[in-house]
């Protein structure tokens, strides 16, 4: 074999060293990452700092400094803006490629949110469109990589629950 014994370990070791370097840089500087850098490290641009508090439950405390550098603080006294409704668009034929979105769509959870519509649009990747009081699209978000809990939590913040 050309790679030799243990050759497959080299890329994993390189990745670990890269992540360790990034973690050290963030902890040393206490700096915030740009959203692109956070995405490259595997963190969502919508990451809330309260999510970083959960890392200890999964023995992931070494990720805490990077998580804190990539997260957004929840506004404690800010009034939440509720939207009049939302449309979750997805292609029925592609739904199997997004099992987390599929689990949400096929569950009873969509019925918990006032004004939420599920629309099957041919060829569409999972998209969430938030509607203003006039029924116009106020925000449009790709939920391609969201899990079921993220979709439910986001909708809980943006729509009125029934």
Swiss-Prot record:
Keywords: Endoplasmic reticulum, Selenocysteine, Signal. GO terms for biological process: 'de novo' post-translational protein folding; response to lipopolysaccharide. GO terms for cellular component: endoplasmic reticulum lumen. Residues 1-28 form the signal peptide. InterPro entries: Sep15/SelM_sf (IPR038219), Sep15_SelM (IPR039992), Sep15_SelM_dom (IPR014912), Thioredoxin-like_sf (IPR036249). It holds the Pfam family Sep15_SelM. It is found in: Endoplasmic reticulum lumen. Forms a tight complex with UGGT1/UGCGL1. Interacts with UGGT2/UGCGL2. Interacts with RDH11. Belongs to the selenoprotein M/F family. May be involved in redox reactions associated with the formation of disulfide bonds. May contribute to the quality control of protein folding in the endoplasmic reticulum. May regulate protein folding by enhancing the catalytic activity of UGGT1/UGCGL1 and UGGT2/UGCGL2. This is Selenoprotein F. It comes from Mus musculus. The lineage of its organism: Eukaryota, Metazoa, Chordata, Craniata, Vertebrata.
């Amino acid at each position: 074999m050309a790679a030799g014994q243990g050759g497959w370990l080299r890329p994993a070791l390189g990745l670990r060293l890269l992540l360790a370097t990034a973690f050290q840089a963030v902890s040393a500087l206490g700096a915030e990452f740009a959203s692109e850098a956070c995405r490259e490290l595997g963190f969502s641009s919508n990451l809330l700092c309260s999510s970083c508090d959960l890392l200890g439950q999964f023995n992931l405390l070494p990720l805490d400094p990077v998580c804190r550098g990539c997260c957004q603080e929840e506004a404690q006294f800010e009034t939440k803006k509720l939207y009049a409704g939302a449309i979750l668009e997805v292609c029925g034929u592609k739904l199997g490629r997004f099992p987390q979105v599929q689990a949400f769509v096929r569950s009873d959870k969509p019925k918990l949110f006032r004004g939420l519509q599920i629309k099957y649009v041919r060829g569409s990747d999972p998209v969430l469109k938030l509607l203003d009081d006039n029924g116009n699209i106020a925000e449009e978000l790709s939920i391609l990589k969201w899990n079921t809990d993220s979709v439910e939590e986001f909708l809980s913040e943006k729509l009125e629950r029934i």
